[in-house]
């Protein structure tokens, strides 16, 4: 019997344990940041342990970094976390993409951009959106701080193998509809827990035709569908992306092995979902989890339970309204979901020649310094600034309310991030998850049908 892609990568990394029980996995790459690593490093010190594989451990600063004055960190806790990681990197011999360095940025962008993320690897990080790296045909998943310490000490991790869920996506995406709309539609349709206990393999002609940026967007939000893992078969698009990157010096001798990473025709999946995207619309969330979304043309649904009522109360909306009825106050282009170069290029096409409404605060936060530099070479910064956007330094920024970039209480934000929970972007902030194109088209203060304005 054939194997799934996920099974192939998993089985190659099992050091000990039987199927159906926790198995000891070898970890090929450990990515860390300033929030979930301090206690783990301290645990090593208390036990007088060394870092097992500093050569497989890479750090960046992203969650707490300011995006305006990056070297003036006013928050004491944020400053302590950042300086602690800088010291730990020195003490334990960890390569760090430090503040202001050419590669610094959001951890899930730094890995792919530097060539650290590669097909067939097991990759962990103390961050729930680590599934992003699964777009390369890797097994990548988020872990907690105690698990971070375990990987520090042993370069291994106990995990129970999940079931396999195949999501077969076909059809040509309509103009103005993107990878972000695909994953939002899946979560809206099947719920925030449909992937619980599964590894999601995204397949089909639509996936094959996506860029690596689009594939990363889809895998990034596997966790919002309840899954720890999202994975896509590596192909020539993947290999071309990895080739020539700083940490991909093993490319020539590895690519033939990477071509073996695919699900066999006779592989058995525990569940299969099929999706035709040929009539898919732009998606907009109305509530307080990613499942609470609609097609742009649809009204918001009736109240079915207490959770719906609470969401409507928090968001200041009512059933029957539409996305175009929302009075927006913020537009945020950023996050590990949609702050890559192609995202900014697409948004710039819509923004060019327009002006941000006086009632709108619009900011662009490139996900990494690499993206920022490439965007500036293309003149994207000028396009955004001429339209009235703020052009910021890289970081997690407004995706989460733990740095200076926050949405004011009661204000609606068109956001390219991944979570719309209560308080996610700041106390009382009202988040609407959309694609970069939809966010860019909302600069006049209202959501509009981006299919009518995309160029």
From Swiss-Prot:
Q: How is the cofactor bound?
A: Binds 1 [4Fe-4S] cluster per subunit.
- Keywords assigned: 4Fe-4S, Amino-acid biosynthesis, Branched-chain amino acid biosynthesis, Iron, Iron-sulfur, Leucine biosynthesis, Lyase, Metal-binding
The terms under GO molecular function for this entry are:
3-isopropylmalate dehydratase activity; 4 iron, 4 sulfur cluster binding; metal ion binding
Q: Quick one: which pathway?
A: Amino-acid biosynthesis; L-leucine biosynthesis; L-leucine from 3-methyl-2-oxobutanoate: step 2/4
Q: What class of enzyme is it?
A: lyase
What EC number(s) is this enzyme filed under? 4.2.1.33
Q: Which cofactor does it need?
A: [4Fe-4S] cluster
**UniProt-annotated binding residues for [4Fe-4S] cluster:** 336, 396, 399
Q: Name the GO terms of the biological process aspect.
A: L-leucine biosynthetic process
Q: Which reaction does it catalyse?
A: (2R,3S)-3-isopropylmalate = (2S)-2-isopropylmalate
**Pfam families attached to this UniProt entry:** Aconitase (PF00330)
Q: Which family does it belong to?
A: Belongs to the aconitase/IPM isomerase family. LeuC type 1 subfamily.
Subunit info? Heterodimer of LeuC and LeuD.
Functional note:
Catalyzes the isomerization between 2-isopropylmalate and 3-isopropylmalate, via the formation of 2-isopropylmaleate.
In Swiss-Prot or TrEMBL terms, this protein is called 3-isopropylmalate dehydratase large subunit
The organism encoding this protein is: Staphylococcus aureus (strain MRSA252)
At the highest ranks, the source species' classification is: Bacteria, Bacillati, Bacillota, Bacilli, Bacillales
């Amino acid at each position: 019997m054939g194997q799934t892609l996920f099974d192939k990568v998993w089985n190659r990394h099992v050091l000990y344990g039987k199927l159906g029980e926790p198995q000891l996995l070898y970890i090929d790459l450990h990515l860390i940041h300033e929030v979930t690593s301090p206690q783990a490093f301290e645990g090593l010190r208390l036990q007088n342990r060394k870092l097992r594989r500093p050569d497989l451990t890479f750090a960046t600063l992203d969650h707490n970094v300011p995006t305006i004055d990056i070297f003036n960190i006013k928050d004491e806790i944020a400053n302590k976390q950042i300086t602690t990681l800088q010291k730990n990197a020195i003490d334990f011999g960890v390569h760090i993409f430090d503040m202001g360095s050419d590669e610094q940025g959001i951890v899930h962008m730094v890995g792919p951009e530097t060539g650290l993320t590669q097909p067939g690897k097991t990759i962990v990080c103390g961050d729930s959106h680590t599934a992003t790296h699964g777009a390369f045909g890797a097994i990548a998943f988020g872990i907690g701080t105690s698990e971070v310490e375990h990987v520090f000490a042993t370069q291994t991790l106990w995990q129970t193998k999940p079931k396999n869920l195949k999501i077969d996506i076909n059809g040509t995406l309509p103009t103005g509809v993107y990878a972000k709309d695909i994953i939002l539609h899946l979560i809206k349709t099947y719920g925030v827990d449909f992937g619980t206990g599964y590894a999601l393999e995204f397949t089909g002609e639509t996936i094959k035709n996506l860029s690596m940026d689009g594939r990363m967007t889809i895998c990034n939000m596997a966790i919002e569908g309840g899954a720890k893992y999202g994975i896509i078969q590596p192909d020539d698009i993947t290999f071309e992306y990895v080739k020539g990157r700083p940490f991909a010096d093993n490319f020539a001798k590895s690519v033939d092995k990477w071509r073996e990473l695919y699900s066999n025709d006779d592989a058995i999946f525990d569940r299969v979902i099929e999706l035709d995207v040929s009539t898919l619309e732009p998606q907009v969330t109305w509530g307080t989890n990613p499942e609470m979304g609609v097609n742009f043309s649809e009204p918001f649904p009736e109240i079915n339970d207490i959770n719906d009522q609470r969401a409507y109360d928090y968001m200041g909306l009512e059933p029957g309204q539409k996305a175009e009825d929302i009075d927006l106050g913020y537009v945020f282009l950023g996050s590990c979901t949609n702050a890559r170069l192609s995202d900014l290029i697409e948004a710039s096409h819509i923004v060019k020649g327009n002006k941000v409404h006086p009632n709108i605060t619009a900011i662009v936060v490139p996900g990494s310094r690499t993206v920022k530099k490439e965007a500036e070479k293309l003149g994207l910064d000028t396009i955004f600034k001429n339209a009235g956007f703020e052009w910021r330094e890289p970081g997690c920024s407004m995706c989460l309310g733990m740095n200076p970039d926050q949405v004011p209480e009661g204000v609606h934000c068109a956001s390219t991030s991944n979570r719309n929970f209560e308080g996610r972007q700041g106390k009382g902030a009202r988040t609407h998850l959309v694609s970069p194109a939809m966010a860019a088209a909302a600069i006049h203060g209202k959501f509009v049908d981006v299919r009518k304005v995309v160029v």
